[in-house]
Amino acid sequence: MDSITIYTTSSCPYCHAAKDLLKKKGVTFTEIDVTGKPDQRRAMSARAQGRTSVPQIFIRERHVGGCDDLYDLDRAGQLDPLLAA
């Protein structure tokens, strides 16, 4: 399994934006589409401290949060070191 996991739904524009940033960074990730999959959505929520919105992004076991959080890390210069660790 890749060290980056992103929980998504097929129609979520924020999910697409987060995946685009990760692709731009040249990293591979595991995408778990929770569309119509309540068991996977519950597992995502449990792993994301109760958050139910998508995307939910994990780098290794660190919960990064959603799309805005990912872009905030990038703007702050903290995403590349996190991806390289």
Predicted features, each with a name:
Residues 16, 39, 65:
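Residues that form or flank phosphate/diphosphate-binding pockets in enzymes
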Residues 34-52, 78-85:
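Thioredoxin-like thiol-disulfide oxidoreductase module
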Residues 1-28:
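Local sequence-structure signature of Cys/Sec-based thiol-disulfide redox active-site neighborhoods
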Residues 20-22, 45, 71-73:
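Short, glycine/charged-enriched secondary-structure capping and boundary segments
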Residues 59-85:
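Non-catalytic, surface beta->alpha helical segment in thiol-disulfide oxidoreductase systems
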Residues 49-58, 68:
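Structural micro-motif
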